[in-house]
């Protein structure tokens, strides 16, 4: 009933659906009680009654429905939070509906082909943000490098504003390590500016690295980096593995302090080779010399 007291909403809804040739009405279970009213209107007009499919609600948890009023995300919110449209569509399609088999990742065209209302569950579905993160990471990994670089660049540039650092090269380090796009800025901020860090980062048990060994490595790698002709992955790697061999240590004992000095972080996308290549020779050497000063 509208505010003017007339039953125009239900009337218009039935007329509209009939004129559009609607055969199936799919809606939330909260509308189940209104079905008899619609049926009376269809019968009054002498029209065929469509088939009704009433879907169970999507829940925040076992007791509460999702609600924008209570801070649950809308589609627009999820996109703004770094989720891909295709990943959201895929995940939402599986809320309250189950395809046959174990496959979970589907393109929209695949979903259109396999969808059948018989797979709709009578039980409410619970929205699991961690599951959506998993779906999103799978979609990110499946993208072509060029497509990922295109969607990642705006997020890279939030923290890496220096245009001399190639966004596509940085994106290549991120693609297999990113779940949502909004994680990107804090992962790569060290490219734009070397963060403050303590010498304790040079201590790493697995790499058998400590402050003294790190100082020795940096003192020896700097002239080797200075002597490289073509600043590329192959030559940067060769300088480090060659030093490790000459010192009689494993590669990790050389690469750990180089990466810490170059990035100022213990956890980075990419290793010492890729980071040094993107930074360039001059900036890499500058950062390695800063590390030497820290190490005394």
Pin down the residues of each PLM region.
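Active-site cores that bind ATP or allylic diphosphates and position pyrophosphate for catalysis
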Residues: 1-54, 60-66, 99
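Residue-level signal for inorganic ion chemistry
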Residues: 17, 38, 63, 88, ...
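Mature, solvent-exposed C-terminal subdomains and processed small-chain segments of exported/organellar
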Residues: 32-36, 80-86, 94-96, 212, ...
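A conserved active-site cap/scaffold subdomain adjacent to cofactor or substrate pockets
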Residues: 70, 74-159
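Charged substrate- and nucleic-acid-binding regions of tRNA-handling and nucleotidyl-transfer enzymes
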Residues: 234-295
